[in-house]
Regions:
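Structured mid-domain segments that build the active-site/substrate or prosthetic-cofactor binding neighborhood
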Residues: 282-287, 298-301, 311-321, 335-357
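Catalytic alpha/beta active-site cores
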Residues: 1-265, 269, 290, 295-298, ...
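Loop-rich catalytic cores of soluble enzymes, especially ATP-dependent carboxylate-amine ligases
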Residues: 263, 270-273, 319-327
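Active-site-adjacent loop and "lid" segments of alpha/beta metabolic enzymes
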Residues: 324-336
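Short, well-ordered amphipathic alpha-helical segments that serve as non-catalytic structural scaffolds
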Residues: 238-241, 279-283
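Extended amphipathic alpha-helical segments enriched in small hydrophobics
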Residues: 269-281
Length: 357
């Protein structure tokens, strides 16, 4: 293994930070360095135009490895992500045909948006006909009041097809905070309802059933720090309220999925996903989640570190899509998707460039 401080290009004399600053100051010809080259972000901190190895000395995160707590560099050892496309279901047969078509074109994750009144076993069977639930990540967005019912229908359908439920991966987007967030109306008794959904979700071990839809903030123009802060507070509210309702912390944490937006702020978006995983890992660890199976991924006090892994889906922003030169949106969504990929998300959706039309 190469040494971290191995000297490369030793034939060139080292240049100190002071020498760099002297050269930059001379080239600026009197223009203040802070004014011309320091990026003052909306998040409240300044970004310098160059950094040196000395700037990261003492940072523990530089020693983190992929798949290791606190998951700064990802919750797994590779950086594979799923390509997800959402389908708004108006005709279940037509949606099934659309799903099969895009799967053959390379999509690896499907998202179905279904009206609550349409949730029944017959429609779900039509929708999923010919789709292997063990091979394709399946995600469902429907009315909160039908989430528990939908989970039961899916579990029965997968069993009927002889699928291994441990291998079936996906999510049901139960979101008790959308109503107060988007409509300003209080959602009473959400803890009891969320607990019922969580208990129903035990039938689908590989499914996340509690959603943190942080993309609402992103699409409303929030700064990255605001989106991240609200998302973590949202996730912590699940943990706090449901553990008080005597549900195990490990079970609650493992059923939460974070859905972030992706803005055009390339480097800070990469940092956002890395910071989100690290912060969430520490939040979950503070609840001392008990390991529910024989596993080597434990903390110093025996707490479950698998529960501290953040499941992240990301979707390119709609806040900055333009109507007037729509093909510019192709460039924006491209850079947004790239930052999410480098940031280590588990799946992503790139919205159509003409979505605003």
């Amino acid at each position: 293994m190469a040494e971290l401080k191995e000297k490369l290009f030793s034939e060139f004399a080292p240049v100190s930070t002071e020498e760099w600053m002297a050269k930059i100051t001379a080239d600026l010809k009197g223009v203040p360095f802070e004014k011309k080259l320091v990026w003052k972000t909306g998040e409240g901190f300044n970004v310098n135009p160059f950094y040196r190895a000395e700037d990261i000395e003492g940072l523990k995160t530089t020693e983190s490895l992929p798949g290791e707590f606190p998951y700064v560099r990802g919750t797994k050892k590779d950086n594979d992500w799923k390509v997800r496309q959402n389908i708004e279901v108006t005709c279940f047969k037509g949606a099934n045909e659309k799903a099969l078509d895009i799967l053959n074109k390379g999509v690896t994750s499907l998202g179905f948006i279904i009206k609550g009144s349409d949730v029944n076993a017959e429609n779900i069977a039509t929708l999923l006909d010919g789709i292997c639930p063990e091979c394709v990540e399946l995600n469902f967005n429907t009315c909160n009041c039908k989430a528990e019912m939908l989970i039961g229908i899916l579990a029965d359908y997968f069993k009927g097809k002889g699928a291994d439920l441990e291998k079936c991966k996906g999510s049901v987007n139960y979101d008790p905070f959308k109503k107060p967030l988007v409509k300003g109306k209080e959602n009473e008794n959400w803890v009891e309802a969320a607990a019922a959904v969580l208990k129903a979700g035990a039938a689908l071990p590989g499914y996340k059933v509690l959603a943190v839809n942080a993309f609402y903030f992103n699409n409303a123009g929030a700064y990255i720090s605001q989106e991240l802060g609200y998302a973590l507070a949202w996730g912590n509210e699940y943990m706090s309220q449901l553990t008080e309702a005597e549900l195990p912390a490990a079970i609650v944490a493992k059923k939460i999925k974070f859905n972030f937006g992706i803005s055009s702020n390339y480097f800070l978006e990469i940092a956002k996903f890395r910071a989100a995983r690290m912060l969430w890992a520490n939040i979950v660890a503070s609840y001392n989640p008990e390991c529910l199976r024989d596993c080597e991924n434990k903390g110093p006090n025996g707490e479950c570190r698998c529960a501290a892994k953040m499941k992240v889906h990301a979707e390119t922003s709609t806040f900055n899509l333009t109507l007037f030169d729509a093909h510019v949106n192709l460039l924006r969504t491209q850079t947004e998707a790239m930052s999410a990929a480098l940031g280590g998300v588990d799946s992503m959706t790139v919205v159509p460039f003409d979505k605003t039309f």
